[in-house]
Amino acid sequence: MLSAFEKALFFLLVAGTLGLAWFTFRWMFGAIRRGDGQLHLNELPRRVFRAVEVALTQRTTLRARPGTSVIHLFIVWGFVYYILINTGDLIEGFFDVHFFGDGRIGGVYRLLGDVLSVLTLAGVIYFLVRRFIAKAPALTFRENVPLHERARPGIRRDSLIVGLFILVHVGSRFLGQSFAIADRAGDPWQPAAGLVARLWSGLSFGTLETWSHLTWWLALGTILAFIPYFPYSKHIHLLMGPLNYFSRPDRRSLGALEPVDFEDDSREQFGAAKLEHLQQTHLFDAFACIMCNRCQDVCPAYVTGKELSPSALEVNQRFELKGVMRGLAAGEDSPRPLLDFAISHSAVWACTACGACVEICPVGNEPMFDIMHIRRDQVLMESEFPAELQGAFKGMETSGNPWQMSDSRMAWAAGLDVPTVDDTDDYEILYWVGCAASLEPRAQQTARALVQVLQAAGVKFAVLGERERCTGDSARRAGNEYLFYEMASANIETLNEVAPPRILVTCPHCLHTL
């Protein structure tokens, strides 16, 4: 048990370290609140359950890299259990009690602590070896990917600090248990610590007590020393990852974008040119990022050698935010545009908007949406976009399709006796054909085959015919939200007039938009 002086010292250290961390967290969440939109906190019970379930099961992590993910799972369980262990050690330090006692419950408590300590230590050693000795390619970025000036050395330094913190914290506590076991001549509930305790069999009672006392301070002292650094470290994902799942928007589909209110006369910025223009949930993403690069593994642009890395985008924003979050929280503007530090102009237009990065992220980050918002700024505010898109935008605006083709949208149906909504009211399905199936010869085969299936099945259907226009999804993904807004408004008017019972589509762009 601690002396009165040690108890007072501990309280002072706790107050100091929590005070320092409080200022950082206040700046962090103040910077996040500078973003556009809001964090989503509706249906709290469901959101809390989702956050806890994802954190404890690690199901989103286990979707890729199964071996590494299982090791990470043990570390997570160890971290969660160590909240209980540290609470117990704190109580034992301040009061002359044995946490959970010496009975069966206390035995199970110590057994789980013993097993999880070993698994955690082994897991952290594995990850340190993987990063610093094996230098796993999955944890690196290609040289052509733009990185924040502080990112490349910062990632390695931060990983080392976090790894050593866990080793010292868990290792000190584990050694402390071995000294205590040697002091009381064994504990069958702690087999691993018991093996280490044999090394101390020749030490005196006083020496064992001293080392047990020192390791108590070392184990809990490392936490106190780490807490002020915690908000700046990658370890912050332990808090921000579950909170990200807790506060992220509920999307009806993987790539569903937030609409822009063009009727709001007070709005001066469309899209994201600077950090504070991003959605609040996407600023949250930067702090939740684990820097595992799983999104990079599945990014088709990165795999084919482009400058785009979804992981680098989040990492770059994270390092910039760490430097400017105090000013952002105070109401200042961020000093640099996103294209100066977060992502290159080439990388912005390399994204295919496939959503693979969103689907794979263990903590629910959405780097694809950051890119979509940057594109909105480039198109709507700066009129900067690849020349190839000019023709597509013009085609969607004037011809109702991205290829500027003036062909009939019913040419594909020649000889099939396909009814339009102007021909009949007796139909149960409106087949939305889409631009490709209407105008592109290979895709027309899909439309014809589907119609033949519907006719053979006796399904009553109709198409819009010449009234059908592109849904504008390609314009939206390319950042031209206003063109999409105009096209969507026209399509909504048409659909409200027709009022179809059900809609059938074969185009994924049409599906997402409708």
What are these regions (language model features)?
Residues 2-133, 277-286, 312-314, 321-514:
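Iron-sulfur-cluster electron-transfer modules
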Residues 13-21, 120-124, 167-168, 210-246:
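Alpha-helical membrane-embedded segments
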Residues 21-40, 91-95, 126-141, 175-189, ...:
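Juxtamembrane/interface segments at transmembrane-helix termini
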Residues 32-55, 135-154, 188-200, 239-268, ...:
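Juxtamembrane inter-helical linkers in multi-pass membrane proteins
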Residues 73-84, 160-184:
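Hydrophobic alpha-helical membrane-insertion segments
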Residues 91-108, 141-150, 178-211:
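Membrane-interfacial helical/loop segments at transmembrane boundaries in membrane proteins
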Residues 115-118, 123-167, 171:
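A conserved hydrophobic secondary-structure block that centers on an alpha-helix together
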Residues 213, 227-351, 399:
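Ferredoxin-type iron-sulfur electron-transfer modules and their immediate structural context
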